[in-house]
Curated annotation (Swiss-Prot):
GO terms for MF: GTP binding; GTPase activity; magnesium ion binding; nickel cation binding; protein homodimerization activity; zinc ion binding
Similarity remark: Belongs to the SIMIBI class G3E GTPase family. UreG subfamily.
UniProt entry keywords in alphabetical sequence: Chaperone, Cytoplasm, Disulfide bond, GTP-binding, Nickel insertion, Nucleotide-binding
Organism: Sporosarcina pasteurii (Bacillus pasteurii)
Name of the gene this protein is made from: ureG
Single Gene Ontology BP annotation: urea catabolic process
GO cellular component, as recorded: cytoplasm
Cellular compartment(s): Cytoplasm
Protein name: Urease accessory protein UreG
Keyword match S-adenosyl-L-methionine: no
Recorded superkingdom: Bacteria
InterPro entries to which the protein is assigned, alphabetical: CobW/HypB/UreG_nucleotide-bd, P-loop_NTPase, UreG
Length: 211
């Protein structure tokens, strides 16, 4: 089986690492999983996941990009390719690698050579107009997670308006409104991973059409 490389991107503080943690906890009993995190000067996110005992330590690699976060996932992804190769050497049965980018702006996207698909994470506290502002992460990511919906009343965001704007921005692409700390929205993301990436429940003919 081909190892699925799933990117997770979004601005600083939007909930990327929490999503990685929650997905790993939910999927690790069913699939062989590993994680790569990207930080500019530290391995803070990797250390957090290790300390939380989400996965075995050897299944988590922290990459220090030393520069613009989006460069390491697009223009020069060599460090991440090396990390992928290292994980596959350690575990020859890997089914899913979650690859978290460093925090970046709305223009960041993953190289299609690096990942098979990517989830983009924004949060309500950044403003209800984020979907209208667009950007490649919002409009072209394979799945969009609008996180921290519980904060809407405190930051003056009308969720109904934000959802309508998201529908327009996504143009049919999948998304969910979530509070990932409480696992709200998690089921939709997992269902998408299983159906669209792992192609579970699809016939050979329909799976071929999806590739």
């Amino acid at each position: 089986m081909k190892t699925i490389h799933l990117g997770i991107g979004g601005p600083v503080g939007s909930g990327k690492t929490t999503l990685v943690k929650t997905l790993s906890e939910a999927l690790k009993e069913e699939y062989s999983i590993a994680v790569i995190t990207n930080d500019i000067y530290t391995r803070e996110d990797a250390n957090f996941l290790i300390n939380e005992n989400i996965l075995e330590k050897d299944r988590i690699i922290g990459v220090e990009t030393g520069g613009c976060p989006h460069t390491a996932i697009r223009e020069d992804a060599s460090m991440n390719f090396e990390a992928i190769e290292e994980l596959k050497n350690r575990f020859d049965d890997l089914e899913i690698i979650l690859l978290e980018s460093g925090g970046d702006n709305l223009s960041a996207t993953f190289s299609p050579e690096l990942v098979d698909a990517f989830i983009y994470v924004i949060d309500v506290s950044e403003g209800g107009d984020i979907p209208r502002k667009g950007g490649p992460g919002v409009t072209r990511s394979d799945f969009l997670m609008v996180n921290k919906t519980e904060l809407a009343p405190y930051v003056g965001v009308d969720l109904d308006t934000m959802k309508n704007d998201t529908i327009k921005a996504r143009n049919g692409r999948p998304f969910t409104f979530a509070n990932i700390k409480t696992k709200k929205g998690l089921d939709e993301i997992i269902a998408w991973i299983k159906s669209d990436l792992l192609l579970e429940g699809k016939t050979n003919e329909s799976a071929s059409e999806s590739k």
